[in-house]
Amino acid sequence: MAGLKVFSFALLLILTFSLIDVEGYNVENGGSLCCNNHPKFGKCNTKNDDQRCNSWCLNGCDNGKGGYCKSMSHGGQCHCYC
């Protein structure tokens, strides 16, 4: 009987943590990239990077608006439009 309780608790923990996306995107919104800066995208300083960022946001954001390289104090980051 105790084994069943331990198994049930472990299963509950696994299911709970499987709903958390490690990269910080919500499961509820489909992992959409919208309205966020994305340091994981990599460098984003040139016109070519700007076009690559826009394509990346178009593919990963549900609103179809794309994105741009946003100037930041520590270098540019890809930012997807809201």
Swiss-Prot record:
The keyword Kinase does not apply. Disulfide bonds join C34-C82, C44-C69, C53-C78, C57-C80. Keywords: Antimicrobial, Disulfide bond, Fungicide, Plant defense, Secreted, Signal. The keyword Disulfide bond applies. Pfam families: Defensin_like (PF10868). Belongs to the DEFL family. This is Defensin-like protein 22. It comes from Arabidopsis thaliana.
